[in-house]
């Protein structure tokens, strides 16, 4: 059982100072460096006249300096808010407005201003890291204090900041280190998801808590299949963490198999549905490896259920279950009145336990709608539809609302609609998902009533709309296809009939 995340990680700087903690394309950093960098930053933050316990935005990509900054912020007694370099400027601006952070630490150059918020620039940060200090980490984040805050999609175009406390994270990491997963000692783990995506917590903190090494794959590599396929066999990893969608890309490379990556023993998936096809293909490529399907919203700290996908499981299930609840967590399946439903009946998944967030940062209205207390434990309305069988095995069946998962990213269709409505060439629009036969979202399609325009073709109009949207929203939220209509169907009460459009896109 972990008492404190920071103390656990810092201990490795004493017991194995020269062990590599971070490797990005052959450039390595040690546990001693991690402690020295994070101590130096914490010492510097302590000298600044910053509001106590207010969070700090950390802007950057997949680098060692990002990890060191996270730990330095936490050592100073504050939560960090990770924002990836590939975020649109507007997202950085909105998060800064919502979070009201004590400061912004720019590990990479900021692409836009952040008003009056104090900023530590990349050059200043480098100088801080280079300053030796003798730091006493005596006021690190602990207990119910926020450890990190990750912003997810919001229905009005305003993202929601999910507050994850130190104890939330400990509950999660303790589970990851348990026999449920059987992770190797000092794991060599793939670190591929961006740090602003809570799936990254699945590789970062269990690995650091076990004194292992993170092997980072930057976005520049993962976006270029040639570079990616060349890099994969060079990684001496034994633990793989990614979305199923990223695995689907890697499986396009025939040489991605146990023969060329003989050290790989564990595959962990989260963020979206793991299809039977993906799991079966992976099992053929890596017959002796252990494959785990996990499930959980960001609001419950990464994941709360797991199941090992064995040959027997593949033979038994056409649509893979999401698994069993972790030992300290209770999951109920309820109807629209909040009453528990019989085993095997579909209902909303209610998640209660010590890894459930206290709510959304500076958003009491949304917090009150989604979070409550259940028998003395914090609980969360997941909005996910599922079933539970008599043995406590859970299956995922979809969303209560119009929220989808695509390529591991959670997207609220209403937020996409919000941005579409702001686009200058659009009169009316709605975004809907396209599912494949494995019930996985493969595409987001925008049904659009355009304003009168002079574009020579639909293609030219689409190009102009997409270009505008790139400055307003995350790339993964932009619809892949645009279908132009003279009008959209309406419900009897005058709202756009989204369900009928979804049926049109997904004929049975």
Swiss-Prot record:
Subcellular compartments: Cytoplasm
CDD domains: DltA
Residue sites binding ATP per the record: 152-153, 293-298, 384, 396-399, 495
Transmembrane among keywords: no
Encoding gene (name): dltA
Pathway: Cell wall biogenesis; lipoteichoic acid biosynthesis
Reactions the enzyme catalyzes: holo-[D-alanyl-carrier protein] + D-alanine + ATP = D-alanyl-[D-alanyl-carrier protein] + AMP + diphosphate
BP GO annotations: lipoteichoic acid biosynthetic process
Catalytic activity, EC: 6.2.1.54
Native source species: Lactiplantibacillus plantarum (strain ATCC BAA-793 / NCIMB 8826 / WCFS1) (Lactobacillus plantarum)
Descriptive protein name: D-alanine--D-alanyl carrier protein ligase
Disulphide-bridged cysteine pairs: none
